[in-house]
UniProtKB/Swiss-Prot annotation:
Bias (Acidic residues): 1012-1025, 1076-1108
Protein name as it appears in the record: Protein CROWDED NUCLEI 2
Main location per the UniProt record: nucleus
Functional note: Component of SUN-protein-containing multivariate complexes also called LINC complexes which link the nucleoskeleton and cytoskeleton by providing versatile outer nuclear membrane attachment sites for cytoskeletal filaments. Required for nucleus structure organization (e.g. size and shape).
Amino acid composition bias (Basic residues), ranges on this chain: 917-927
Length: 1128
């Protein structure tokens, strides 16, 4: 026999108290406290010593078998010990895993039980609250009932007084009737007899009433008054007749009031019935409470059954642990095979095994003792608590039953007493009626009786007061009982809390089991758990002491209640004795009054028959109604009991259904919650992703907006810089225009002097021919048109100080400058300089062609004609606006041209003025064809500028509509003229503005030449002539030609605006086409020169009023001299 086997045999502990008192045995689960003890160490088999103290139980036959087998050899035993230790280790590990699994299951079950327990506690608390409410309602109903009883008693007293008054009235009426019936003589005789009787009985009255001497005098007075009344009877007869009539009327009124009072009594009885019904309801509530108490007892029984089931489960877990031990043995066999491979670990294992053996023995000893102590203590505590709880419940039940029975008996007794008192009062009323009938005869006796009655009434009132005080005491006792019930409920709640604490302790013990089973891994934690268990035992001992103190306090309170009950019983017995005495006294008085009433009934029976019949009918109705009420109360009590039983059953069924529904609801809610949680998590993830995307998009948009804002700011800065540059350029242009004006004036003066000198030479006979030859050679004087060299009015208006300047124009100009892409902001200041360079550095001048690159505002036909004398060369169309790609000049070229312009500004101005004032000269001979490369280049430029002509020609045409009708007609004539003869003139007709646009396209005919000198188209054709006649291949000259085209277009626009503003007439020069290129050029030149001189003179007279357009000799040599001077 091992300690484990002994511990397995301990299945349950029965409490002898429960067994003795009710025959109930409470089985407690050992699985919550007792862990499965490990097997005994193998050292017990070697005979070295047994530490368990169970050697007496061992069988000697087993030892013999061991010796026979050879198990007692030390070597084999050591090996077996090692194997057993390894097996034990494996078994312990398996047990640990099994116990952990079981503990997990137990924890799950524990959670379920905790939830169920919480639900039951909630139901119990609700039931307690309902009980408290019902108790408060019951107390309130009791107080109301008692108040109503007092009110009813007061009402009864008032009704009795009314009845007495009515009886008095009836008596008086009866007396009047008797007096009316009897004759005066009979009345006198009766009066004498009454006086004699009064005198005879006065001695008896005097003997009885020594205590009231004052009333004796009153009796003597009344006797004398009776004597006087006898004498006055005759006088009263007439008065009584009149009073009879009044009394009849009063009788009718009294009967009406009596009926009203009867109705009031009926209503009062109905109220009493309602009160009785409320009392029955209160009884029902009390029965319900009893049923709830019974339900609680049933629940406790169920808990006991659950504990038994737990014990069974523990046994099952023990069997499972044995199976796990078998599995562990199998694993140990496998470990033995592994031990052979790991000899190095055996030394450490042996040392650890010795330590584990010692530690196991200590643990086994401690566990065996401590666990058994804890189990015994807990079982004893639980048994004592259960017994106390059951005893308390039984005592409370008994006390409640007794109190209810007492209350019911008291109510019934009170009812019986009330009925008896009513009957007695009725009898007393009858006796008093009889006595009042005899008042006239026996007033002295009646007064004495009245005194005695008054004294008795005082006694009764004192008794009633005492009864009311006793009732108050009873109420206070009831309240104290209710307080005790509340305390009992509190104790129950505390007991439930303690049960919860015990369950928690059981849980902690289970946790300790787990920790003990894991002692191989958690040896250090075992000590702390043992300390915790000790602390817990101390806590349990303290709780036991507290419970004992509470029990003692409860017993003391119960003893106090018993004492109060004993005092109450004594008082009750005393009250019952006093009641019996009072009833005896009432019986004696009733018998005496009956004897007196027997003498008077004969006289009053006839008059009181009607009243008795009414009273009897009323009493019969009252008794019938009371019996019916009692039967109803009994039936209602039985119904209430049945209803309570049905309520119990329904409540049990509802509780079971609620539990099932709650479990189902919990499962459904958990599933729904998981579904919702997953859905919400998915939604949250999607929202997060969407938010991240939106944030990324917002960040990208924000970065783009920031970049755009930065670009806009940069662009604004550029625009501001460009506007500043534009304003600076405009200011520079204004200064240049002013300088040019001054130089023109100087040049005009020099020109006038030169012309005067030429005229003087012409007048000379010998020098005239030379001068004519000089003039006809190349020199053509420019016209002194000062308006054309001035900057345009729009440019002057756009100056910073002008009033016509606008921001929109500045912004447009700046944007156009940006679009050009190559220093477009500097071009307005370079236009005039580039014009000067175009005049000076013209390639036609180097080859000594007769091309006049004069003023772009007023081109004469002579220069155009000279340029168009080359055969096989097509005129190029002029681009009337600046293009950023083709007509723009690079910055390096502009710098180069600026440097060249600064050197040759004076010479360019001279040539410009000469060409502007020169008339249509005589055409020269055609030179050889130009270089084909230049023509190809100009053709490409023509193609690139073709597309832009259509959109920009209208700009110049609109500006020239004011005074350019002749120009337009002249261009159309030159465009459609075909082949003409030499010096062919065309009549110029005025044309309406906007009729036709300039036709600037290149003509297919070779010799067709446009010859407008003064307008934009003429300027463009001059540019084309200059580009076509350029024989040089230098890139500098080509760029100069391109810049000349752009600058001349600008100056043409300015000249047109100036001419339109100044209304200056424009001379249309008829073109001349050279069809013949004969070698006899001298004759043709002479004739053409004469014609040209005449035409130029006519044109100059028409336009300017000057004769400066005639050819003069010596102009070609001056031009050459200026060219050589400037180039060198």
């Amino acid at each position: 026999m091992t300690p484990r086997s002994e511990t397995h045999k301990i299945g349950g502990v029965t409490n002898p108290r429960n067994a003795d008192r009710k025959g109930k045995a409470v089985a407690f689960s050992d699985d919550l406290v007792i862990p499965t003890l490990p097997p005994p160490p193998i050292g017990t088999l070697t005979g070295q010593g047994v530490s368990r103290g169970h050697t007496d139980d061992m069988d000697m036959g087993d030892w013999r078998r061991f010796r026979e087998v050879g198990l007692l050899n030390e070597a084999s035993m050591e090996k077996k010990d090692q194997e057993a230790l390894l097996e034990k280790i494996s078994t312990l590990e398996k047990e640990l895993y099994g116990y952990q699994h079981n503990m997990g299951l137990l924890l799950m079950e524990n959670k379920e039980l905790v939830s169920k327990h919480e639900q039951l506690n909630q139901a119990f608390q609700e039931a307690q609250e309902i009980l408290k409410r019902e108790q408060s309602s019951h107390l309130y109903a009791l107080t109301t009932v008692e108040q109503r009883e007092e009110n009813l008693r007061k009402a009864l007293g008032l009704e009795k007084q009314c009845v007495q008054e009515l009886e008095k009235a009836l008596r008086e009426i009866q007396e009047e009737n008797s007096k009316i019936r009897l004759s005066s003589e009979a009345k006198l005789v009766e009066a004498n007899a009454l006086v004699a009787s009064v005198n005879g009985r006065s001695s008896d009255v005097e003997n009885k009433i020594y205590s009231a001497e004052s009333k004796l005098a009153e009796a003597t007075r009344k006797s004398s008054e009776l004597k006087l009344r006898l004498k006055e009877v005759e006088t009263r007869e007439s008065v009584l007749q009149q009073e009879r009539l009044s009394f009849t009327k009063e009788r009718e009124s009294y009967e009406g009031t009596f009926q009203k009072q009867r109705e009031y009594l009926n209503e009062w009885e109905k109220k009493l019935q309602g009160k009785e019904e409320s009392i029955t309801e209160q009884k029902r509530n009390l029965n319900q409470r009893e049923e709830k108490v019974n339900e609680i007892e049933k629940k406790l029984k169920l808990k006991e059954k659950e504990l038994e089931e737990w014990n069974r489960k523990v046994d099952l877990s023990m069997s499972k642990s044995k199976e796990t031990e078998e599995d562990i043995t199998k694993r140990l066999e496998e470990l033995t095979t592994k031990e052979k491979e790991a000899h190095t670990l055996q030394i450490t294992l042996l040392a650890k095994e010795n330590e584990l053996r010692a530690f196991e023995e200590k643990l086994i000893a401690r566990e065996g003792t401590e666990i058994q102590k804890l189990i015994d203590d807990q079982k004893e505590v639980l048994g004592s608590k259960m017994l106390e709880f059951e005893l308390e419940c039984e005592e409370i039940r008994k006390s409640l039953d007794k109190e209810l029975q007492r209350k019911i008996e008291e109510l019934e007794r009170q009812k019986v007493e009330i009925d008896h008192s009513e009957e007695k009062l009725e009898k007393r009323n009858q006796a008093m009626n009889k006595k009042f009938d005899r008042v006239n005869e026996k007033e002295m006796d009646l007064e004495a009786k009245l005194k005695t009655i008054k004294e008795r009434e005082k006694i009764i009132q004192a008794e009633e007061k005492r009864l009311s005080l006793e009732k108050q005491q009873l109420l206070s006792d009831k309240e104290s009982l209710e307080d005790l019930q509340q305390e009992i409920e509190k104790i129950r709640a505390e007991m439930t809390k303690k049960e919860e604490m015990i369950e928690e302790e059981c849980k902690s013990l289970e946790i300790k089991k787990e920790e003990r089973e894991e002692y191989l891994r958690l040896q250090s934690e075992l000590k702390s758990q043992i300390e915790k268990s000790r602390v817990h035992e101390e806590f349990l001992s303290k709780e036991v002491e507290n419970l004992k103190q509470e029990k003692e306090r409860f017993e003391k309170e119960w003893e106090i209640l018993d004492e109060k009950q004993a005092v109450y019983n004594k008082e009750r017995i005393r009250i019952s004795e006093e009641k019996e005495k009072f009833e005896r006294f009432q019986l004696l008085e009733g018998e005496r009054l009956k004897k007196e009433e027997s003498a008077l009934r004969v006289q009053i029976m006839q008059e009181l028959d009607d009243i008795r019949l009414q009273r009897e009918s009323f009493e019969a109705n009252m008794e019938h109604e009371r019996s019916a009420l009692q039967e109803k109360v009994k039936l209602e009590q039985s119904k209430v009991i049945d209803d309570l039983e049905m309520m119990r059953r329904n409540l049990e069924i509802e509780l079971q259904e609620r539990k099932e529904q709650d479990e189902k609801d919990l499962l459904d809610r958990m599933a729904q919650f998981e579904d919702k949680r997953m859905a919400e998590l998915s939604d949250i993830n999607h929202q997060k992703q969407a938010l991240n995307r939106e944030m990324e998009e917002m960040m990208s948009k924000r970065s783009a907006l920031q970049k755009e804002s930065e670009e806009i700011a940069k662009h604004k800065d550029k625009l501001k810089e460009q506007q500043v540059e534009m304003h600076n350029d405009i200011s520079e242009l204004s200064t240049l225009s002013i300088n040019l004006k001054k130089r023109r004036e100087v040049f005009g003066r020099e020109r006038s002097r030169f012309l005067a000198f030429v005229q003087k030479l012409k007048d000379c006979g010998s020098c005239g021919q030379l001068v004519n030859d000089f003039v006809l050679s190349d020199l053509q004087l420019p016209s002194n048109d000062e308006v054309a060299i001035l900057p345009p009015i729009g440019v002057l208006n756009d100056l910073p100080g002008s009033s016509n300047a606008s921001d929109s124009c500045n912004i447009k100009k700046s944007l156009d400058g940006d679009a050009s892409g190559s220093g477009g902001s500097r071009r307005p200041s370079m236009s005039i300089l580039q014009k000067c360079t175009s005049i000076i550095f013209s390639p036609s001048k180097r080859v000594e062609h007769g091309i006049d690159t004069g003023k772009p505002e007023q081109r004469l036909s002579s220069s155009v004609a000279v340029g168009m004398e080359t055969k096989g060369e097509k005129p190029l169309p002029v681009d009337l606006r600046l293009r950023p790609s083709s007509s723009s000049i690079p910055e390096e070229d502009e710098e180069y041209t600026d440097s060249r312009v600064q050197e040759t500004s004076e010479g360019s101005q001279l040539s410009e003025f000469q060409s502007s004032r020169r008339g249509r000269g005589r055409p020269r001979k055609a030179k050889p064809a130009l270089n084909p490369t230049s023509s190809v280049k100009h053709a490409s430029l023509e193609e690139s500028s073709k597309d832009e002509l259509s959109g920009h020609v209208s700009v110049t045409s609109k500006k020239t509509t004011g005074g350019g009708g002749r120009k337009r007609q002249h261009i159309d004539d030159t465009a459609t003229g075909g082949k003409r003869r030499r010096q062919q003139t065309v009549a110029v007709l005025p044309q309406t503005p906007g009729q036709r646009h300039y036709n600037l396209r290149r003509k297919k005919t070779v010799d067709q030449v446009p010859a407008d000198v003064e307008d934009n188209a003429a300027a463009g054709e001059d540019d084309a002539d200059i580009a076509a006649s350029a024989p040089s291949k230098d890139t500098v000259e080509e760029t100069v030609v391109e810049t000349l085209r752009a600058r001349r277009i600008e100056t043409n626009a300015d000249v047109v605006s100036a001419e339109n503003n100044g209304d200056v007439p424009v001379a249309n020069v008829e073109p001349t086409v050279n069809e013949d290129t004969n070698e006899d050029g001298d004759e043709e030149e002479d004739e053409a020169q004469d014609d040209d001189n005449e035409e130029n003179q006519d044109d100059d007279d028409d336009d300017d009023g000057d004769d400066d357009g005639s050819p003069r000799p010596g102009e070609g040599s001056i031009r050459k001299k200026l060219w050589t001077f400037l180039t060198t």
